[in-house]
């Protein structure tokens, strides 16, 4: 495998080489999140995952050519994984945890390991290999939400005086009653007390 990419000055991040024979191809956020959570709950080793789609794949600059995963040009990367204790029950996520009542009203809280949520560059500084979660929270008036939404694709909604941004390895938060939680786009249900932390380099992916 040939080393390439750098996350910090003077430090290599990633290697080149095809997806191994025992690797698993996961096509979207839901498949990846379920695989990680099932392995963690079953105390099983995580397989190497090939990514032809999803928010983590988009953040890493992957291509839509799934055949690339079998070539020497494919990139191997060690990725951080998030875990969240939700009212006493543990879950895992790879791209993002989002807590909200609505995108249009009330408090919005998110912990991002990946920059993208769909077409939105929601957390433009988030990097899934830097050991930190980008935690963004705020409760903007409707007019400001409309303006911010128009900038989400480009990531220029930040910085914003009404949004708080923190970069942390772990944190705890208490949500307002009636707030729902999504992990990698999958609904978990209503949540009140969250304890979030990052597991550095817990996942081996190929793009």
Model-derived regions: residue spans:
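Internal helical hairpin/lid segments
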Residues: 103-148
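Short low-complexity stretches enriched in small and charged residues
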Residues: 87-96, 125-130, 154-164
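Short, low-complexity, polar/charged sequence segments that are solvent-exposed and flexible
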Residues: 68, 98-103, 113-115, 127-132, ...
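ATP/nucleoside-binding phosphotransfer catalytic cores, i.e., glycine-rich phosphate-binding loops
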Residues: 137-207
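A hydrophobic alpha-helix/topogenic segment detector
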Residues: 90, 97-98, 111, 135, ...
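A short, structural micro-pattern
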Residues: 76-78, 103, 127-130, 165-167, ...
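Exposed beta-strand and adjacent loop surfaces of beta-rich binding modules
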Residues: 79-81, 132, 178-180
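Catalytic core of DAGKc-family lipid kinases
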Residues: 1-116, 122, 167
